[in-house]
């Protein structure tokens, strides 16, 4: 069994709250060889490092409804995009809804029921998995998709910017034989994306199943 370094995770949370991401880890890692360190959404991309790049709403769905539904599932899942969508909610004059039966999928997405509507929120791959038709010729690298009752309702294009501290800090952790564990909840933050887009050594990081990642990233966990 892996010996997860909760002390590292607590340090990471404090650092991320100040916008420093992984800045304090290399020194701490040196004294704990062979351990593991948990990396959450906000450790990689603190608030301000993910920006909204555009919104497109489809069919007869209103912007307020699509934004409200999407923001609700993002909030309820504890995803690192929560602040971004909360700010969007306010600017669009939308409100959070009451969602039931939230489910997190291994394929990169979420589902819940809102006022009798079956709502899906996730990546393009998740929409394909759930057989939601997507526009032909769609060319968006990172986005949040929303479908309502099996019909595509909205696309939120995102731009992720990696803080300067993250790459060298992860390199230091690996050099000190401290294995990063991706305890991410943002369904876009998968090893393939981190390696291809940001050249991070994601192949040397553990990426547990979705429910285990949720357990590890639970802020109430001791």
Where in the sequence are the language-model features?
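Residue-level signature of catalytic and energy-coupling elements of molecular machines
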Residues: 12, 43, 116, 146, ...
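Conserved ATP-binding TGD loop and adjacent catalytic N/P-domain core of P-type ATPases
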Residues: 116, 154-222
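ATP-binding catalytic core of ATPases
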Residues: 59-110, 114, 129-130, 185, ...
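Conserved cytosolic catalytic loops of P-type ATPases
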Residues: 26-69, 113
């Amino acid at each position: 069994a892996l010996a997860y370094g909760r002390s590292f995770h607590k340090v990471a949370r404090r650092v991320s709250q100040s916008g420093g991401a992984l800045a304090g880890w290399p020194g701490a890692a040196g004294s704990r060889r062979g351990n593991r360190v948990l990396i959450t959404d906000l450790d990689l991309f603190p608030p301000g490092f993910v920006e909204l790049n555009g919104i497109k709403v489809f069919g007869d769905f209103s912007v307020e409804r699509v934004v409200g539904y999407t923001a609700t599932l993002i909030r309820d899942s504890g995803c690192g995009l929560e602040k971004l969508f909360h700010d969007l909610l306010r600017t669009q004059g939308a409100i959070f809804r009451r969602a039931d039966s939230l489910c997190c999928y291994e394929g990169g997405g979420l589902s819940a029921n809102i006022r009798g509507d079956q709502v899906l929120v996730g990546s393009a791959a998740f929409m394909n998995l759930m057989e939601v038709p997507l526009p032909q010729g769609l060319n968006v690298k990172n986005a949040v998709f929303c479908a309502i009752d099996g019909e595509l309702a909205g696309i939120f294009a995102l731009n992720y910017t990696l803080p300067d501290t993250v790459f060298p800090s992860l390199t230091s952790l690996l050099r000190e034989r401290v294995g990063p564990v991706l305890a991410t909840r943002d369904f876009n933050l998968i090893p393939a994306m981190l390696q291809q887009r940001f050249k991070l050594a994601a192949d040397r990081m553990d990426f547990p199943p979705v429910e285990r990642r949720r357990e590890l990233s639970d802020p109430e966990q001791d």
